[in-house]
Amino acid sequence: MRVIVRTVSELCITVGALIVLFVAYVLFWTGVRADGAMNDQIDQLHRQWSQGSVRPTAAPGRKAAAAGEQTVAVAKPAPYRYGKAFAIMYIPRLGFTWNKPVLEGTGRDVLAKGLAHYAGTAQLGQEGNFAVAGHRRTYGDPFKDFPRLRPGDAVVLTDGTTWFTYRIDKGPYKTVPTDVEVIDPVPRKSGYTRPGRYLTLTTCDPEWGHSHRLIVWAHLDSTQSVEAGEPRALRR
């Protein structure tokens, strides 16, 4: 009997240790790997842009008097390639050091390396809905502080030639994973009623679950050439 009790106890200890190791892997190691992967993607983009290996997406235009920033006419970029980074996102509300790469596609392999652009939604700066997903927890926790986002917050992206500043209009809005209308070209639940240049960000809810989704919607507020310097939203 003692042998049986000892064996069961040892098995319980072993299983408990394995669970602890698994939790440590999920909480720590996936984050370390994801942070490294995201930094690598950003470094690669900066190298490409410094070498001029990016197709220009905009040409200088008039000055936006209210914002004091240059408005540019945005041309359609080349098609995005699955799993490849094409832009960097900045959200000052989440910290002035917060920056994440945006890659094409929403596969698990893509989400492990950064934010994921929903294939089939609008390209950056184009008419329609530029929709992006990101993990709330694990894999670097890119959208851990998603609930802090508020209307009026800036979401800034660059593709190496142009800065795009979006302004949040609504959210965070809670819904279910099957509610795919949130990334429609004109997402009605956002309050938008006509075509425009929109941005949708999505992540999981609750923080450690995935039974629901949190959504924010934004509109394109301004654009400017990278030669003009950082947009006002990124200036401290």
Mark where each language-model region is.
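N-terminal membrane-targeting segments
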Residues: 1-47
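Beta-strand cores of secreted/periplasmic/IMS beta-sandwich domains, seen most often
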Residues: 23-26, 85-101, 150-167, 203
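Extended boundary segments
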Residues: 70-119
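N-terminal low-complexity, Pro/Thr-rich disordered segments
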Residues: 33-81, 193, 227-236
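Extracytoplasmic/periplasmic soluble domains downstream of a signal peptide or transmembrane helix
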Residues: 126-130, 136-236
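A glycine-rich, hydrophobic loop/mini-helix early in the fold
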Residues: 119-127
